[in-house]
Amino acid sequence: LMIPKLLDAYKLILKLPQGHWKEVKLEEIKGLIADCAGLYLEAVADQQNAVKNGEVKVTIEAINRSNSDIELGSVNSMFISFPTSLKPYELKKNKKIIIESVAGTFNYQNYSSPYWLNKKGTIGMYHVDDKNNIGLPEKMMSFPIVFQLTINGTYLSYNRNLVYKFNDPVKGEVYQPFDVLPIATASIQEKVIIFSDNNAKQIPVTVRAGKDNLNGSVKLESPNGWLISPESQMFSITKNGDDATLIFSVTPPKNQSEGKLIPVLTVGNQSHQKELFTIDYDYIPLQQVLLNAEAKIVHISIEKKGENIGYIKGAGDAIPESLEQIGYRVTSINPSEITSKNLNQFDAIVVGIRAYNTVPELAFKQPELNSYVENGGTLLVQYNTSHRLVTNEFAPYQLTLSRDRVTDEFSEVTLLAPDHQVLNYPNRITRADFENWVQERGLYFPNKWGKEFTPILGMSDKGSKQTKGSLLVAPYGKGYYIYTGISFFREL
C-alpha cells in the first residue's frame, strides 16, 4: 500500500523547481520505494581488476520481493558498454533475474587509487581535485551501473556500484571493490639506496603484469652522472598478476650526488611509472594504491668503523637494511640469544624502536646487555614510550623517560657538545644533517638522567622549552651506552 503513495510523492517532487534539496529528497524517496519493494539490484564483475580499454564481464542480478509491477528496462554505464540487445525483463515477485556474462568494453580513463593520494600534497595536507570527496573514507561510486526500472508505470533509475565478490571457505561471501589498474606496474624494493663508495650496485626491478601475455621493456631513469647497465631490458609475463625481476647495474658518479631512480615501463606505445601497493585488512575494504615508482639513490662519502652489528628487533624499522647498504654485516638477535658469549662478537648492538615496550624477555636480559657494554661494546637504544615498559632498568645508570617530544621537523637543532666524539668520529655531524627532516624530530625524550650521561643535542618546538634528552651518551666500563629518542627510523 505504501509504494503507490510513495510514487505519487515522487511525482510531486519532480514538479518542484530545480534545486539541491529537490535532488536530495528524490534520492531519499527512491530509496524508500526500493526498501518497501524489497528491491535487490547488483552488478558483479568476474574479476577484481581490469585495465583501460580491456574487457570485463558483468553479471546483473535483480529481485523484486513485492507485489508491485516492476520491469527492468535496461542497464547501462558511463564506463562499460553493454550490448544494445538487452531486452526488458519483468521482475516477478521473488523470482531472481540473472543476466550472466554481459561483456563490455572498459572505457574508464583513470586508475583506481584512494582519491587523496592521486596527486602530491603539501606538508600536512592532501591534494583533492573533487571537493565532494573530501572527508569520505572512500571515493563515491567509482563505477556506477544504472538500472532503468519501471515501477507501477513510473520510470525510476537506481545506481549500484560495480563490485567483485567471491566465496571464502571461512568468511563466506566476500565483497571487494572493482578496480582499474595499469597494464603493468614496477617496483624497487629498497626505497633508499646508499652508495658509500664508487662501486656499482645490482638493483632488482620487479615488473607486475596487469593482463595475460604481457610483453614490454623497462629502463631506469637516473640523475646526471649515474651509469645504468644495461640501458633497457625486455620482459615477458604469461599470466595476469605474475611478476618478473630484472637486474640493473647502477654506478654512482665520483662526486657526491643524490636523486631519484625511476623504473619506466613501455608496453606498446604507452609508458607506465606506477607502483602497486595492496592494503588488505578484514575491517576495511581492500585498497589498491598506486604511487610513483621510484627509489632515492644517494652517493655520499661515509667513513665506516667496525664490521659486525647486532640488531634486537622492536616494533619494526628499516635500520638493519640501511646499515647493510653502507657495508655492515647485520645479524638479528633473538631474545633467547642475548648472552655474553653471543654478544661479544658484535662491534655494536642496536635495539629497535619500542623494543622495551614489545619484547617481554628484555626485562631479564638487561644485565647481559650491560655486561656487553662494560666489556667494550657499544649499545644504542632507540626510542621507547614511557608507558608499559617491560622494565624500568633499561640503562646502566639512572634514565627516566618522559612524554617530551619535538614535532616540528624544521625546528632548530643545537649542538650541546660539538666536540664530543659521537659528533666527530668516524664522520662529522653538523646542523646541516638535520635539514629536510621527514617527520618530527623525536619523541619520548628522557627528562632525567644520571650525571654519567652527556646530552649531545638540544631542540624544541616553537615557543617551548628546549629539551636536551634526545641523544644521551654515557661511558660504562670499557664501552658506551647511547640512548636516543630521535626519529631516525622515519628518515630511512
Would you name each region that the model predicts?
Residues 92-161, 250-260:
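Eukaryote-biased detector of low-complexity, proline/serine/threonine-rich segments
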Residues 55-84, 100, 112-114, 143-150, ...:
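Beta-strand-rich binding/interaction modules
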Residues 271-352, 385, 490:
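Aromatic-Pro/Gly-enriched surface loop or interdomain linker
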Residues 354-435:
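A glycine-rich, often tryptophan-bearing local segment used as a flexible ligand/cofactor-contacting loop or short
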Residues 10-53, 80, 165-196:
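Low-complexity, acidic Ser/Thr/Pro/Gly-rich terminal tails and inter-domain linkers that flank the onset
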Residues 403-492:
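Catalytic beta-strand/loop cores that center a nucleophilic Ser/Cys/Thr
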Residues 19-24, 155, 175-218, 284-292, ...:
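Extracellular ligand-binding/catalytic regions of CAZymes and related secreted enzymes
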Residues 88-97, 235-244:
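Short proline/glycine- and polar residue-rich coil/turn motifs
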